[in-house]
UniProtKB/Swiss-Prot annotation:
Region: Disordered, residue numbers: 1-86, 98-126
Protein name: Uncharacterized protein MPN_412
Matches recorded under InterPro entries: P1_N
Annotated organism of origin: Mycoplasma pneumoniae (strain ATCC 29342 / M129 / Subtype 1) (Mycoplasmoides pneumoniae)
Residue runs in coiled coils: none
């Protein structure tokens, strides 16, 4: 009773191109141009006017894709942020874009007079130099507890590596040397997250002894999936001699890590902060 009444789609041969009524449109050479106009909302006051973005479309000939309409040009890329360089296509954030949202936080960060409506400029509360001055406080070690099917008790525990904050941030560009935006696109609210801003730290290729002999072949020749199976089920990496048998791989949990930050617990991997197991 209520709702949309759906009918079969029908083509109207008399309407080869359309544009919104009320807009100043020009139709020439098989193209339709919708110019930039303004629309008023809730009265006639100037502050309620909304600018309409310009979009140009053209209709292909009947021999091209059944005469479909394609987008020719638009100016959506120029809106809504216009600060920057290179024809306003590159946005450059300033310190004023980030700030405290309450007066209590502003007193701690050294920004006086900040309000939710007028936040003060953002300043890092922990710099890389402060981390370097006290490496024992911010250093971390990683302990891994994983299933080892070839071990006697099927369990292995190992220390993978030690996170040295000075080494981790040594090759960072200057804009990454504070707990701000890291190169994973994550915001570092905690200082210890800086320790996990590494590229390739959890890369299983750094420890080839974790894998069996079939891993080398799989990295270069096989995908690990049965491409002939419509369900694309995982078959595991196998040697040529055992290709007729199912041989799923049991990997330590480090192998499933990517270049991820902000991790404290993942699977059965435990990150222990403030402990040096050298």
């Amino acid at each position: 009773m209520f709702g949309l009444k759906v009918k079969d789609a029908q083509k109207d041969d008399q309407k080869s191109s359309e544009y919104l009524s009320g807009e100043a449109g020009s139709q020439a050479g098989g193209s339709t141009q919708g110019t930039s106009t303004t629309t008023q909302r809730r009265g006639s006051s100037n502050e309620n006017k909304v600018k309409v973005l310009q979009v140009a479309m053209k209709k292909k000939s009947d021999s091209e894709d059944n005469g479909q309409i394609e987008l020719e040009t638009n100016n959506l890329a120029n809106a809504p942020i216009k600060r920057g360089s290179n024809n306003n296509q590159q946005v450059q954030l300033k310190a004023d874009d980030f700030g405290t949202t309450s007066s209590s936080e502003s007193g701690q960060s050294g920004t006086q007079g900040s309000t939710p409506s007028n936040p003060g400029p953002w300043t890092p509360w922990l710099t890389t130099e402060q981390i370097h001055n006290d490496p024992a406080k911010f250093a971390a070690s990683i302990l891994i507890l994983y299933d080892a099917p070839y071990a006697r008790n099927r369990t292995a525990i190992d220390r993978v590596d030690h996170l040295d904050p000075k080494v981790m941030t040594a090759n960072y560009p200057p804009s990454w040397r504070t707990p701000k935006w890291n190169h994973h696109g994550l915001w570092d609210w905690k200082a210890r997250d800086v320790l996990l801003q590494t590229t390739g730290f959890f890369n299983p290729r750094r420890h080839p002894e974790w894998f069996d002999g079939g891993q080398t072949v799989a990295d270069n020749e096989k995908t690990g999936f049965d491409v002939d199976n419509s369900e694309n089920t995982k078959q595991g990496f196998q040697k040529e001699a055992d290709s007729d048998k199912s041989a799923p791989i049991a990997l330590p949990f480090e192998a499933y890590f990517a270049n991820i930050g902000n991790l404290t617990w993942f699977g059965q991997a435990l990150l222990v902060f403030g402990i040096c197991l050298s």
